[in-house]
Amino acid sequence: MSLLTEVETYVLSIVPSGPLKAEIAQRLEDVFAGKNTDLEALMEWLKTRPILSPLTKGILGFVFTLTCPSERGLQRRRFVQNALNGNGDPNNMDRAVKLYRKLKREITFHGAKEIALSYSAGALASCMGLIYNRMGAVTTEVAFGLVCATCEQIADSQHRSHRQMVTTTNPLIRHENRMVLASTTAKAMEQMAGSSEQAAEAMEVASQARQMVQAMRAIGTHPRSSAGLKDDLLENLQAYQKRMGVQMQRFK
């Protein structure tokens, strides 16, 4: 796996799924391939994206700045600086300075990542802030190691939270989660169906599923009533794909 592929993988792991994630992935690919070099336009685009947390925007802004060739005097962006200040916690800043001193002696991506993984996400973000604000300088490889370690820390906590939700025994949460997944799958079906005539059936199935979820939410139903809803939808989707000769997609 190349360095930039690894960076893209880690950064995308902290972006919520949805159309915006696909858009960000495309922007990252373009930047890494040298196709998009207008840093100012990129940062303006990033700043106005909805859904993303300030920290995720800060990390993406840091990656774009590292990768795009920019003029010396180009202004640093406030939204990135604010996101990478470690919540203003002096402890984070102290740890960030210690980490920076270690990273300055490091020259490899993996070495930097290994060192950085022993610090908290707050300290890692603060350290990125130091580098972003030109208070410190490290090699691009080392900076990318720091980025990936930060993303790994964030993705770990997101995974723990997700696992808690998936394994919860609370029937109401499980019920709502099944309906959300069914609704998301229906949306994906509609997007995949496109505008061909054969797509009408898939669109109909997806539309009915979304209406059913809306009705279940409106009238309130028994927590077990949503069981199998997403699986039924997936079966319909896969049958449609087979008929269309489309490569089977994995949503599960």
UniProtKB/Swiss-Prot annotation:
Give the bilayer topology: Peripheral membrane protein
Additional free-text comment from the UniProt record: Most abundant protein in virion. When expressed alone can form virus-like particles in transfected cells.
Coiled coil feature spans? none
Q: Where is the signal peptide?
A: none
Would I find Membrane among this entry's keywords?
A: yes
- UniProt keyword Transcription present: no
**Membrane-binding as annotated region, ranges:** 1-164
The gene coding this protein: M
Identify the domain of life. Viruses
Q: Which GO terms describe its molecular function?
A: RNA binding; structural constituent of virion
Keywords from the named record: Host nucleus, Membrane, RNA-binding, Viral matrix protein, Virion
Q: Name one GO cellular component term.
A: host cell nucleus
Region annotation (RNP-binding) maps to 165-252
Name its species: Influenza A virus (strain A/Aichi/2/1968 H3N2)
The record's function comment reads: Plays critical roles in virus replication, from virus entry and uncoating to assembly and budding of the virus particle. M1 binding to ribonucleocapsids (RNPs) in nucleus seems to inhibit viral transcription. Interaction of viral NEP with M1-RNP is thought to promote nuclear export of the complex, which is targeted to the virion assembly site at the apical plasma membrane in polarized epithelial cells. Interactions with NA and HA may bring M1, a non-raft-associated protein, into lipid rafts. Forms a continuous shell on the inner side of the lipid bilayer in virion, where it binds the RNP. Determines the virion's shape: spherical or filamentous. Clinical isolates of influenza are characterized by the presence of significant proportion of filamentous virions, whereas after multiple passage on eggs or cell culture, virions have only spherical morphology. Filamentous virions are thought to be important to infect neighboring cells, and spherical virions more suited to spread through aerosol between hosts organisms.
Task: State what protein this is by name.
Answer: Matrix protein 1
Q: What's the short name of a Pfam family annotated to this entry?
A: Flu_M1_C
Give me any GO biological process, just one.
viral budding from plasma membrane
| Record note on quaternary structure | Homodimer and homomultimer. Interacts with NEP. Binds ribonucleocapsid by both interacting with genomic RNA and NP protein. May interact with HA and NA. Cannot bind NP without genomic RNA.
Query: Where does the protein end up?
Result: Virion membrane; Host nucleus
Family indicated by similarity: Belongs to the influenza viruses Matrix protein M1 family.
Q: What InterPro entries does this protein's entry cite? A: Flu_matrix_M1, Flu_matrix_M1_C, Flu_matrix_M1_N, Flu_matrix_M1_N_sub1, Flu_matrix_M1_N_sub2, INFV_M1
